[in-house]
């Protein structure tokens, strides 16, 4: 989720998660249809069946729909951010490392964080907006935005930040956004 300075959270539509069942179903159906499965069969002239062609069009349409939803969301959000805000702060996340983790890979790819950052940087350059990149090792989520106390034992599953020093209770992502600005 993107957290704006007013505390508003912009949720990603997660198009792949919503359409994954449909894509998998079409892929399974496609594998059952007659087509050349290797180079030898292609050389022998084994052709694709009409149903194979129809299903491959359905599969590409479903995949195109996911890509279009993702692109539309990214374009609209980056346009709003770069036209309404004077400063934008981004965390320099290790997206490649996050994609290597098999538990995070699909959801990180579905968000398209790299493309979002690239478009924010591009559009902010056009509009003359300053983009701040925070170091990936800066403890923005672990630092209290009220008193500055750093909480060492904050897990990813903890969605609210509870400060032991001043007693502040705040949403984890909103706390990080306040610390980045």
Where are the predicted features?
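Positively charged, helix-rich recognition surfaces that bind polyanionic ligands
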Residues: 1-181
């Amino acid at each position: 989720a993107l957290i704006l300075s007013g505390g508003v959270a912009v949720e990603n539509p997660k198009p792949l998660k919503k359409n994954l069942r449909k894509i998998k179903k079409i892929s399974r159906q496609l594998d059952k249809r007659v087509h050349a499965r290797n180079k030898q069969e292609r050389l022998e002239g084994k052709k694709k069946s009409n149903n194979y062609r129809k299903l491959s069009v359905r599969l590409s349409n479903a995949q195109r729909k996911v890509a279009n939803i993702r692109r539309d969301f990214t374009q609209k959000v980056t346009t709003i951010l770069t036209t309404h805000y004077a400063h934008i702060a981004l965390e320099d996340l290790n997206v490649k490392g996050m994609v290597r983790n098999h538990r995070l890979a699909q959801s990180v790819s579905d968000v398209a964080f790299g493309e979002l950052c690239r478009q924010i940087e591009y559009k902010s350059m056009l509009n003359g907006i300053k983009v701040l990149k925070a170091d990936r090792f800066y403890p923005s989520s672990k630092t209290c935005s009220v008193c500055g106390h750093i909480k060492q034992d904050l897990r990813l599953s903890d969605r609210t930040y509870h400060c032991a020093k001043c007693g502040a209770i705040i949403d984890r992502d909103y706390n990080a956004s306040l610390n980045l600005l």
